[in-house]
Amino acid sequence: MVAIRVIRDAGADTQVPLPSYETTGAAGADIRANLPDRGSLTLAPGGRALIPTGLRVEIPAGYEIQIRPRSGLALKHGITLPNTPGTIDSDYRGPLGVILLNAGAEPFEVVHGERIAQLVVAPVVQARFELTEALGETERGAGGFGSTGRG
């Protein structure tokens, strides 16, 4: 298990739980809204907002945290993340915010303390990019965007 060090932002509500896994087999830890006024924020249909979590993290070198939508919010309310997955790099120490997008037809109220997204800790492999004269041939070739079948 990888340890992620966490601190709270100044003024954050200390009663809002830290990210947590809701089941023993969960890949993602739920993260919650930590709104400055302890109230709520309404996202109009098509609207988006940066929702504060009140947290900062220290991720070990060789890892990242991916921020992903919660499937229930997406299915029931159309709430998603426009930059899915969002990436938190191991050298970032700033406040964690989650960009929520209301792709639904109705306004959605983000409530203080509510679970708004999932954090997935993942290993990182950095590559070396080498300029070359040609690429190796494959059966697929340059076919993309549905070239191997419908969608």
Swiss-Prot record:
Keywords: Hydrolase, Magnesium, Metal-binding, Nucleotide metabolism. Its cofactor is Mg(2+). The keyword Lipid metabolism does not apply. Pfam families: dUTPase (PF00692). NCBIfam families: dut, PRK00601.1. Substrate binds at R70, S71, G72, N83, T87, I88, D89. This is Deoxyuridine 5'-triphosphate nucleotidohydrolase. Signal peptide: none annotated. This enzyme is involved in nucleotide metabolism: it produces dUMP, the immediate precursor of thymidine nucleotides and it decreases the intracellular concentration of dUTP so that uracil cannot be incorporated into DNA. It catalyses: dUTP + H2O = dUMP + diphosphate + H(+). It comes from the Bacteria. Pathway: Pyrimidine metabolism; dUMP biosynthesis; dUMP from dCTP (dUTP route): step 2/2.
